[in-house]
Amino acid sequence: MVLITCDLHIHTSASADGKCPVKDVIAKAKERGLDAISITDHDTTEGAKQALALKDPGIMIIPGIEVSTKQGHLLVLGTTKVFEQGKDVLETIREAKAEGCLTIVPHPYHRWRHAVGLHSPDALREADAIEVFNSRYYIGTANNRAAKFARKYHKPMTAGSDAHTCQFVGYGINIIDAEERTVPSILDAIRKGKIESRCKKTPIRTYTSQSFHNVVRKVRRQTSRLKPRRVR
């Protein structure tokens, strides 16, 4: 048996809203004393691939992705595959599990952040685990609701920093009791519920600022789609 300290939900600059290059994420994780991190960028595995390519002996990389499904976001760990966006979340969960990946529903009840739990309770039961602490949700109501659901249905509970900047890497730490210091062993331990969490909230000022910039980015994207085209 070996205890692994791990942040299971981290974004890099490969995400549209990520600010931190891969090498800096790794440096911060090592500074925080983590044994492993899972890089889960939005709908891309480029960040995870870059991290694996660095082959840093000081930290284990669990490749992953945060998939935008029809009902909301889904973490898929143990893969460099890019899963199709917009599909039904249950279909994506089953596809990922069939390929040996680990599925986690992140921030399942956060109303403004693509919360699968608000649209598909079946997905929470189908997934391998539920993220019951997300450091970027300052008010604890949604996290508490996720934990209550997980306990009721005996689902493994995970934490994640959901860091989009380097300074918050490690704000959601998991202590995983794995058989070996390998990615498959870590994922298997999570499936079996051999995991405990230690958490720290993102400061309210930072959370508010990040949320504001995300709203601005979405409005700009929507506005650009509505621009009239020239008729020639």
Residue positions per predicted region:
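Short beta-strand/loop segments at the ligand-binding rim of alpha/beta enzyme cores
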Residues: L3, A96-I104, P108
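Glycine-rich, histidine-containing beta strand-loop boundary motifs that form or position
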Residues: D41, H107, S161
